[in-house]
């Protein structure tokens, strides 16, 4: 899993840098080119017999989606490797919580909320459940603004409700 997570985007080295770092919206043709990176990465690491097949599959499938609308093969549900499903969630969380040349980073709670809102569409329900227990957007001691407008300090997190600290 760790090696697959490290290598999942290796195909991006074959995409022109100006396309990867483009500040404005991508054209349809540019997006098609970006969508080639999983297959390019898979083809590259597939040449190495010392790299395990599960790592290669992660590189190929990390943009597949539960609803079948992902790429490069439009796989659906259980046809997607479990490790690729895990890396997919981590990849999206990382993308959302990192500054990009075209947008500012989201806070951890907004990124987690996005992932949870896309269960059974983009992401596997069971894996999101585990992920949401590992990623704590409001750890102990975090200063938060309540819906009432009051300021509070998080004293405890709720395992089943990560977006509702106490």
Task: Show which residues each predicted segment covers.
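Histidine- and acidic-residue-rich, metal-dependent catalytic cores
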Residues: 1-166
